[in-house]
Curated annotation (Swiss-Prot):
CDD domains xrefs: Phospholamban (cd20250)
Quaternary structure and partners: Homopentamer.
Maturation and modification: Phosphorylated in response to beta-adrenergic stimulation. Phosphorylation by PKA abolishes the inhibition of ATP2A2-mediated calcium uptake.
Cellular component annotations (GO), alphabetically ordered: membrane; mitochondrial membrane; sarcoplasmic reticulum; sarcoplasmic reticulum membrane
Summary of the function given for this chain in its UniProt record: Reversibly inhibits the activity of ATP2A2/SERCA2 in cardiac sarcoplasmic reticulum by decreasing the apparent affinity of the ATPase for Ca(2+). Binds preferentially to the ATP-bound E1 conformational form of ATP2A2 which predominates at low Ca(2+) concentrations during the diastolic phase of the cardiac cycle. Inhibits ATP2A2 Ca(2+) affinity by disrupting its allosteric activation by ATP. Modulates the contractility of the heart muscle in response to physiological stimuli via its effects on ATP2A2.
Keyword terms, alphabetized: Acetylation, Endoplasmic reticulum, Membrane, Mitochondrion, Phosphoprotein, Sarcoplasmic reticulum, Transmembrane, Transmembrane helix
An example molecular function term from Gene Ontology annotations: ATPase inhibitor activity
Protein name: Phospholamban
Record PANTHER family: CARDIAC PHOSPHOLAMBAN
Tissues showing expression: Heart.
One GO process term, biological-process aspect: negative regulation of calcium ion import into sarcoplasmic reticulum
Amino acid sequence: MEKVQYITRSALRRASTLEVNPQARQRLQELFVNFCLILICLLLICIIVMLL
């Protein structure tokens, strides 16, 4: 019985991780894009300040 419960739990974990992965990837991509945009903005501000 313990083995069966362990197998079912591991299977459920695998299924849940497979379902969650695309959403997690989208979130990571969005965070990465936002981070890049912020870095670009900071670089632009630094350049403008140096020019002034």
